[in-house]
Amino acid sequence: METVRRKLEHIEICLKKEVVSKYRPFDDLILLHRALPEIDESDVCTECTFLNRRLSAPLIISAMTGGHPDAREINANLATAAQETGIAIGVGSQRAALEHPDLEDTFSVVRELAPDVPVIGNIGAVQLHRYGPEVLDRVAEMVDADAVAVHLNFLQESVQPEGERHAAGVLGSLREARFRLPIIIKETGCGIPFEDARMLVDSGIQLIDVAGTGGTSWSMVESYRAELRGDPESKEIGMLFAEWGIPTPVSVIECSRAGAQVISSGGVRSGIDVARSIALGAFMAGAALPLLAPATRGSVDVVRVLQRFVRELRISMFLTGSRSLQELSRAPVIITGRTREILEQRGIDTKIFSSKR
C-alpha cells in the first residue's frame, strides 16, 4: 500500500505547503499589445479540436491524482467541471490501481462524469518499461481514454528513498510500443530539451507535454515527505533540486523546433499564460495546482477557475488582434530575462518571436 499512501501524502502536501518554484518564467514573456486590434472581442474564437473532440479552449486539466479513496471526490469534481466547460482532463498516475484494482473507480469516475471531453490516461515510463506495452491498454481501458500520457519523473524518483531510478531502455520501450491511441510524453516539472524531443519525434512520438519548471516542484514535494519521515538528508536534497530543470517557455520552443506537437504546462496560472504558450508554439496548455484546492471544495469552484482562464485567454486574444488560435500563434511575443538568456545560450534568436506576423 506504499503507492496508495504516497498519493494521499502528495495531495496533502500540495494543499498545505509551498511547493511552487520561486522563478516564474512566464513573467519573462510580453505579448505585444495592439492599441488598434481592428477586431471586436465578439470576433474572438477560443475553440479548438484536440484528440478528435471539440473544446471550448486549448486547455487541459493536467494530471493530478487518483489511486486513493479520498482522491475519488477530487477527480469527480474535476471531471464534472471539465464536462461543463468543455475542457480536456488528464488523470494522475494509474499505477496504484494496477497494483490494487479496487481503486480503479478513483480513476474511472472521470470518464463517467466527463463523457464528451478528451480524457488522458497516465502511467510512468518506468512501469511501461517493466510491464511492456500491454500496460497502455490496461490504463486506457480503465478510463476509456482518448490518449495515454507516459510520464517522466526521474528527478522525483531520485529524491524518493523508495524511488525507481531505472531510466535505461525507456526510449526503446516507447519506440516498440505500438498502441491504438496517441501517446503523450509528459515530464513532471523539469521540462524536455530539444535533444530528447528530437529522439522522441524520431521514435514516432508526436505529442509532448513539456511540464517545465516554473510551477509545482515535485522535488520540493518529496522534500516535505522526507521531513514527515524524519529523513533530513532526503529533505535537504529535495530542496537543493527544487529549481532543477528547464523553464516551461524554453522547453516549449525547443520541443516545437524538434517537430513535436507541444502541450505547455508547468507554471500555467492564467489565461494570459495560455496565450503566451500558444504564441511560443504550443497548441494546448495544461494547469493542475490552481485547480486542486477548488476541487476539494466542489465542481462549482473548479468551473469558476476554468471560466476565468478562458475569459483571460479571450481578452489576451482580443488585445493582440487575434481572432483565432492560429492567429494567436503568429502574435509577436517579446522574450526577456532569464528565459531570453537561456534561449540565446542554446543558439535560438529570440527576435524571431518579437517580429512575427
Swiss-Prot record:
Output a single Gene Ontology CC term carried by this record: cytoplasm
- Domain of life, per the record? Archaea
Primary place of residence?
cytoplasm
Q: What class of enzyme is it?
A: isomerase
Catalytic activity field? isopentenyl diphosphate = dimethylallyl diphosphate
Localization per record: Cytoplasm
Q: Does the keyword Isomerase apply?
A: yes
The keyword Metal-binding is annotated on this UniProt entry: yes
One GO BP annotation of this record: isoprenoid biosynthetic process
The record's annotation in SUPFAM superfamilies points to: FMN-linked oxidoreductases (SSF51395)
Name the keywords, alphabetized: Cytoplasm, Flavoprotein, FMN, Isomerase, Isoprene biosynthesis, Magnesium, Metal-binding, NADP
Q: What cofactor does its activity depend on?
A: FMN; NADPH; Mg(2+)
Q: Which NCBIfam families match?
A: IPP_isom_2
What does this protein's UniProt record list under function?
Involved in the biosynthesis of isoprenoids. Catalyzes the 1,3-allylic rearrangement of the homoallylic substrate isopentenyl (IPP) to its allylic isomer, dimethylallyl diphosphate (DMAPP).
Protein name, UniProt field: Isopentenyl-diphosphate delta-isomerase
Q: Which organism is it from?
A: Methanothrix thermoacetophila (strain DSM 6194 / JCM 14653 / NBRC 101360 / PT)
Question: What is this organism's lineage?
Answer: Archaea, Methanobacteriati, Methanobacteriota, Stenosarchaea group, Methanomicrobia
